[in-house]
Amino acid sequence: MKKCRFLVLLLLAFVGLAACSSQKSSTDSSSSKLNVVATNSIIADITKNIAGDKINLHSIVPVGQDPHKYEPLPEDVKKTSKADLIFYNGINLETGGNAWFTKLVENAQKKENKDYYAVSEGVDVIYLEGQNEKGKEDPHAWLNLENGIIYAQNIAKRLIEKDPDNKATYEKNLKAYIEKLTALDKEAKEKFNNIPEEKKMIVTSEGCPKYFSKAYNVPSAYIWEINTEEEGTPDQIKSLVEKLRKTKVPSLFVESSVDDRPMKTVSKDTNIPIYAKIFTDSIAEKGEDGDSYYSMMKYNLDKISEGLAK
């Protein structure tokens, strides 16, 4: 009986040691990976497409929230402090307005171009209307798929610098991702070439589609220019309504991350319907249409071209 009890205890001890060993192995594997932080869901998704499971990834601004003006949570501060690599958009997105990202990296004692990098480096910057100076840049460069490719290339470059052992994986994933984005970009240009010129205008709440407009030859109009200024004032709405009454624009669009009430007022005053919500500052929730950078852009391109072709 004693011998039997001893064997049972020995077996339990062995199982416990095996479990601890397995847990330790899993922990060691996770801790050996790069700790990477991205400021928003779009940058995080591009990073994930290149890095796969080779990194530990944290995205700061939650899906559906505005990256222009965010208040980091304690978890964001902790992850940023421990990060080996931090990706931010740049072009005055996270550093404009309340400058939340500037404060975050300063408090974490992180250094630019050593610990954190702008993924927009190399993009042909577009400025806010009537402006051409630092601090007046339009940050929404990712809405041009060619810029999305630049983002991906910059992310891959920094991952390889920090983690050369996984260079082959990063380069392979980058190549496949670029091919995917390039094909969608070509498809988009063909779609918008077939829309009559008098219908060709994308109307949104925020004036975020400038890069989109330039890439796909679709003029844009908006209620307010950028989310760090007043949003949806009576004068802003009146100005857009007067502009639209002189056009044959068939559809309006409203972004997923803004209050839709100002655009509903524009729709009522012009009798132009809101065709769809589109994604500009964030991807969609997991499992929904637009829950990755690629699917977000495809969704936008499909909805906008459909709405303007009506």
Swiss-Prot record:
Source organism superkingdom: Bacteria
Q: Name one Pfam family in it.
A: ZnuA
- Lipid-modified residues, S-diacylglycerol cysteine kind: 20
Q: How does it sit in the membrane?
A: Lipid-anchor
Recite the UniProt keywords alphabetically. Answer: Cell membrane, Lipoprotein, Manganese, Membrane, Metal-binding, Palmitate, Signal, Transport
Q: Which GO terms describe its biological process?
A: cell adhesion; metal ion transport
What induces this protein's gene, according to its Swiss-Prot or TrEMBL record? Induced at low concentrations of extracellular Mn(2+) and by the addition of Zn(2+).
Residue sites binding Mn(2+) per the record = 68, 140, 206, 281
For this UniProt entry, what is the primary localization, expressed as one broad class?
A: membrane
Molecular function GO labels: metal ion binding
Signal peptide from the UniProt entry:
1-19
Cited Gene3D superfamilies: Nitrogenase molybdenum iron protein domain (3.40.50.1980)
The record's annotation in InterPro entries points to: AdhesinB (IPR006129), Bact_metal-bind_prot9 (IPR050492), Lipoprotein_PsaA-like (IPR006128), ZnuA-like (IPR006127)
Task: Cite a GO CC annotation.
Answer: plasma membrane
Q: What happens when the gene is disrupted?
A: Inactivation of the gene results in both impaired growth and strong inhibition of Mn(2+) uptake.
Role according to the record: Part of ATP-binding cassette (ABC) transport system ScaABC involved in manganese import. Essential for growth under Mn(2+)-limiting conditions. Also acts as an adhesin which is involved on adherence to extracellular matrix. It is an important factor in pathogenesis and infection.
Subunit comment for this entry? Answer: The complex is composed of two ATP-binding proteins (ScaC), two transmembrane proteins (ScaB) and a solute-binding protein (ScaA).
User: What protein is this chain from?
Assistant: Manganese ABC transporter substrate-binding lipoprotein scaA
Q: Which organism is it from?
A: Streptococcus gordonii
